[in-house]
A protein has these predicted regions:
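Conserved acetyl-CoA-binding loop-helix of GNAT-fold acetyltransferases
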Residues: 83-96, 115, 119
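Short glycine/proline-centered loop/turn elements that form peptide/ligand docking sites
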Residues: 87, 91, 109-113, 130-136
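Active-site beta-strand termini and strand-to-loop segments that position acidic
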Residues: 56-58, 140-144
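Conserved N-terminal entry element of GNAT/NAT acetyltransferase domains
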Residues: 1-13, 142-148
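Acetyl-CoA-dependent GNAT
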Residues: 9-82, 91-93
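Conserved GNAT acetyl-CoA-binding A-motif
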Residues: 97-109
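Short hydrophobic/aromatic beta-strand or adjacent loop that forms the aromatic wall/cage
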Residues: 50, 134-140
């Protein structure tokens, strides 16, 4: 676990760096999609209506979580450095500020994310496919008192 790691709300001036992290991690992770599909503008647009939390260590943003409070929906969770507990810390923070069960969607080919969320107490409640997409998704939910 990252001891010197701070989880907090992103400052407005940090959103461009968050958008860069978002695009970089998407391009590395979502290899089944063309890189040009992942755009900074998409993140910045979504961030206008979401709460963006960051994991910061030594002034560097190592991860982010974008949370849409009206639906307790975790829209994005991306980390720059894996296997340090950063994703778990961000996820736990979002769960702590949520007003009920947190839900999210994960693309079916993203097996590492599915394993991570299942390990953190999420269960699959729905499977589907967005219109115009050939990639299936799973909607996962974690109840507030789920052991993680």
């Amino acid at each position: 676990m990252a001891a010197g790691l701070e989880i907090r709300r992103a400052r407005p001036e940090e959103l461009p760096a968050c958008a860069d992290l978002y695009v970089r991690v998407l391009c590395e992770t979502f290899t089944w999609q063309p890189p040009e599909r992942h755009r900074r503008e998409d993140f910045l647009q979504a961030a206008r209506s979401e709460e963006v939390y960051v994991a910061v260590e030594d002034g560097r943003i190592l991860g982010l979580a974008a949370f849409y409070r009206p639906q307790n929906f975790l829209h994005s969770l991306y980390v720059d450095v894996r296997n340090r507990g950063i994703g778990k810390r961000l996820l736990d923070h979002v769960s702590a500020v949520a007003s009920g069960p947190v839900s999210l969607k994960v693309q079916a080919p993203n097996k590492l994310a599915q394993l991570f969320y299942e390990r953190e107490g999420f269960t699959c409640v729905e499977r589907g496919q967005d219109p115009g997409s050939d990639v299936a998704w799973l909607r996962l939910v974690r109840e507030p008192d789920s052991p993680a």
